């Protein structure tokens, strides 16, 4: 007689084992109809799952945060079902849920086409409308291997054969299609109403380039049409804002084959880079950091001591000289420990804060490179704090305050905090990790922050707090981090003289606010759609003369503004003023200053703000005041 405890604490007793669907029905027919799955004692299950002992149960409906995962997983199976209906000779492989959707990989004798996607989506809609039940069965591994071999599904048979002998596997059937899956899935295909196939790509079987190239179909699925419409609009906006396209349009940077994953900064792009660097340098100074510079190439022996050689070698660029092995640094931390170790330190000096704009290199796979967002060479605002255990909480709290102020200045007001915990591959014992994770939890709690925990996603040397920014079109970007490291200082021999004259190992906090400057600039470009705030804009204003008569005055205005420290250009070409205005508007210049005979005679400028906003004619000093205000407040002008 199982007793089922519901989320509100109420209990229901049943005379025999009962399905999740039956519990939902006993509560109400509306809930039974809305049920997509359940959570039994913390585990997501199908509505067909049988509860045979006292358990806690939450019914998953379209209002539950877990609903999207079930719907997307089920829609991936619906796609595979449709492929087998339209292309019976295709073989199915795997189809997981990913962020905002799913994909499924297939083996087929010819490439799928965009027209095939249209036909498949139509078939998926047709199959969903049949509202066929999704039925779970369990069978022994060997029996499942034979089942899929008989179906001609060799990839599925290979997957199951890799499972240890003697284990059972679960299969899900809908109509004529059966797939291997752990589940859970929706109770019937009729629950799948909102989906779209997005694109085609290639993928190697099991991610190994030695294996066959499969065809990957990406899709998205949602609970409500308005959510999907918003997502598709966001994708459309993302394409318009793509920093690679804007980088070319605005003449900021470029890439070329001779330097994969490395950036050629043009003058305008480098201007943005320098503004970000100088801003972050002031943050270092205001927060009590001493700026340092460590070598980019270090001996293999140091990387072995730090743990990078064993845990990160595949991502490092290595070289040899005079029978010694070296590596380009992928991280700055070992170098900062060497600077710390160059002298003897007292507890009175702690916390000791080092900061560097450290240039790092990581051997990223060529297929993973993506504009400024994923590169092989980048610069971090990388800092390391050497402190005692008792100082961790106050240092993390101070960092948290600083990081939020920085993001506010760059235009990000929504920031989510996540705590990444120990990964499977790591240095240090569990006691050290317990201490490090508890220290970060305590600091966040003391700072009054809410946070989400991410098991397994910490760095190999320590847990970390991550700061995730939401941009202007709703996407999130992980930027800032602060990590507790009890391991590396000990591995590299860092010490300080304690109050009792004993030698102790300091705690090291790894911290970065923007992270990779290159990536952060890519995020800024996309967040602002290229309309950089005045303080960051490579060119803050352009002076345009209406005719040759006003060319000298235009030059005078430009020179006056440049002497006051503003980034100003002049356009004295013999072109129509409307043409020049349009051309510079496409370059997203914050302010255009139009001068003709009247302005020359009255020492004024006609000001047009970005987006075609006419601010009228004003004395040059008045425009300077407006420019200074926008720069100091780190704002606009916003495009209309």
Swiss-Prot record:
Its EC number is 6.1.1.3. SMART domains: tRNA_SAD. One of its GO terms (molecular function) is threonine-tRNA ligase activity. It is found in: Cytoplasm. Keywords: Aminoacyl-tRNA synthetase, ATP-binding, Cytoplasm, Ligase, Metal-binding, Nucleotide-binding, Protein biosynthesis, RNA-binding, tRNA-binding, Zinc. Its main location: cytoplasm. It catalyses: tRNA(Thr) + L-threonine + ATP = L-threonyl-tRNA(Thr) + AMP + diphosphate + H(+). It comes from the Bacteria. GO terms for cellular component: cytosol. Zn(2+) binds at residues 333, 384, 510. PROSITE patterns: AA_TRNA_LIGASE_II, TGS. HAMAP family: Thr_tRNA_synth (MF_00184). Homodimer. Catalyzes the attachment of threonine to tRNA(Thr) in a two-step reaction: L-threonine is first activated by ATP to form Thr-AMP and then transferred to the acceptor end of tRNA(Thr). Also edits incorrectly charged L-seryl-tRNA(Thr). Belongs to the class-II aminoacyl-tRNA synthetase family. This is Threonine--tRNA ligase. It comes from Polynucleobacter asymbioticus (strain DSM 18221 / CIP 109841 / QLW-P1DMWA-1). The lineage of its organism: Bacteria, Pseudomonadati, Pseudomonadota, Betaproteobacteria, Burkholderiales. The gene is thrS.
């Amino acid at each position: 007689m199982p007793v089922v405890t519901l989320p509100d604490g109420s209990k229901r007793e049943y005379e025999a084992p009962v399905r999740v669907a039956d519990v939902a029905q006993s509560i109400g027919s509306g809930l039974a109809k809305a049920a997509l799955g359940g959570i039994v004692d913390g585990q997501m299950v199908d509505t067909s799952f049988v509860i045979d002992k006292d358990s806690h149960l939450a019914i998953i409906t379209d209002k539950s945060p877990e609903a999207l995962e079930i719907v997307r997983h089920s829609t991936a199976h619906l796609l595979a079902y449709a492929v087998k209906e339209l292309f019976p000779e295709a073989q199915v492989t795997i189809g997981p849920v990913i962020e905002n959707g799913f994909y499924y990989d297939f083996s087929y004798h010819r490439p799928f086409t965009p027209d095939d996607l249209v036909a498949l989506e139509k078939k998926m809609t047709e199959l969903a409308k049949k509202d066929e039940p999704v039925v779970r069965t369990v069978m022994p591994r060997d029996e499942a291997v034979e089942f899929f071999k008989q179906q001609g599904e060799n990839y599925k048979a290979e997957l199951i054969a890799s499972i240890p002998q003697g284990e059972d596997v679960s299969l899900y059937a809908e109509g004529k299609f059966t797939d291997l899956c752990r589940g859970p899935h929706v109770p019937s295909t009729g629950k799948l109403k909102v989906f779209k196939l997005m694109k085609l790509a290639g993928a190697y079987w099991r991610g190994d380039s030695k294996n066959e190239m499969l065809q990957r179909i990406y899709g998205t699925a949602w609970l409500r049409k308005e959510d999907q419409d918003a997502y598709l609009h966001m994708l459309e906006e993302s394409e318009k804002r793509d920093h690679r396209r804007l980088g070319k349009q605005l003449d900021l940077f470029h890439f070329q084959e001779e330097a994969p994953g490395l950036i050629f900064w043009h003058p305008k792009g480098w201007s943005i880079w320098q503004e970000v660097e100088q801003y972050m340098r002031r943050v270092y100074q205001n927060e009590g950091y001493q700026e340092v510079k460590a070598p980019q190439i270090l001996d293999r022996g140091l990387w072995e001591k730090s743990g990078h050689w064993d845990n990160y070698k595949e991502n490092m660029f290595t070289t040899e000289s005079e029978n010694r092995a070296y590596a380009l640094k992928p991280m700055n931390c070992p170098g900062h420990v060497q600077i710390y170790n160059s002298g003897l330190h007292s507890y009175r000096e702690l916390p000791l804060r080092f900061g560097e704009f450290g240039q790092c290199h990581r051997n990223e796979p060529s297929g993973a490179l993506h504009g400024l967002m994923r590169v092989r060479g980048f610069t971090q605002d990388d800092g390391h704090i050497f402190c005692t255990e008792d100082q961790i909480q106050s240092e993390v709290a101070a960092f948290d305050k600083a990081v939020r102020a920085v993001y506010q200045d760059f235009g990000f007001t929504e920031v989510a905090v996540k705590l990444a915990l120990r990964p499977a591959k790591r240095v240090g014992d569990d006691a050290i990790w317990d201490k490090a994770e508890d220290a970060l939890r305590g600091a966040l709690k003391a700072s009054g922050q809410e946070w989400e925990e991410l098991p397994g996603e910490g760095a190999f040397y320590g847990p970390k707090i991550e700061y995730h920014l939401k941009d202007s079109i709703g996407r999130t970007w992980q930027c800032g981090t602060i990590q507790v490291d009890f391991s590396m200082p000990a591995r590299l021999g860092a010490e300080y003289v304690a109050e009792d004259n004993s030698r102790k190992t300091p705690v090291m906090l790894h911290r970065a606010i923007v992270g990779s400057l290159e990536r952060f600039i890519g995020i800024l470009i996309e967040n602002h759609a290229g309309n950089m705030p005045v303080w960051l804009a490579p060119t803050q204003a352009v002076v345009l003369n209406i005719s040759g008569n006003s060319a000298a005055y235009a030059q005078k205005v430009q020179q006056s503004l440049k002497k006051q420290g503003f980034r100003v250009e002049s356009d004295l070409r013999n072109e129509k003023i409307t043409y020049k205005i349009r051309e510079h508007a496409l370059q997203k210049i914050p302010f255009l200053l139009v001068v003709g005979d009247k302005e020359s005679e009255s020492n004024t400028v006609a000001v047009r703000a970005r987006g075609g906003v006419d601010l009228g004619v004003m004395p040059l000093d008045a425009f300077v005041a407006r420019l200074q205000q926008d720069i100091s407040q780190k704002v606009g002008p916003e495009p209309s």
